[in-house]
Amino acid sequence: ENDFGTKLTIFFGNSWTKLQAEELRQVFDSEYQLFSDFVRFKGNEQTISFAKMALWARSGQLNLGVIPEKIRHYIDDSKDIADIIEAMWASQTNLVQTAQKLFMHRNSLQYKLDKFHGLSGLNLKNLDDLAFCHLLILNG
């Protein structure tokens, strides 16, 4: 980087599943626009995760394209995940407290979190991912 006088910025996009060809193009375009906006307005960070960038865009009232709709679809399609997100948010990501609030065994909770992670690419044990999903639920 220093040898060539350039600055690199790396964006770790989300892992998407169950998308048709047209949806994949829309999601890619939305992520590309999100990344471009981030570099233009806040290009001082060199690495940024998908959820952190999405939270930044939501706080700045920027357009996220089809991203919120797709993530919300994953939330709605996953049994109990909306309740899990709310309970995890209330218990500050503490899995034991979340399981107790939901009257669920901790291993069952972990299984549902892993299943949602595989489907949506978002790890709800990560506070940025959890906050993004929580905001999507709050905003309907």
What is the meaning of each model-derived region?
Residues E1-G140:
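Cytosolic nucleotide-utilizing catalytic cores of signal-transduction proteins
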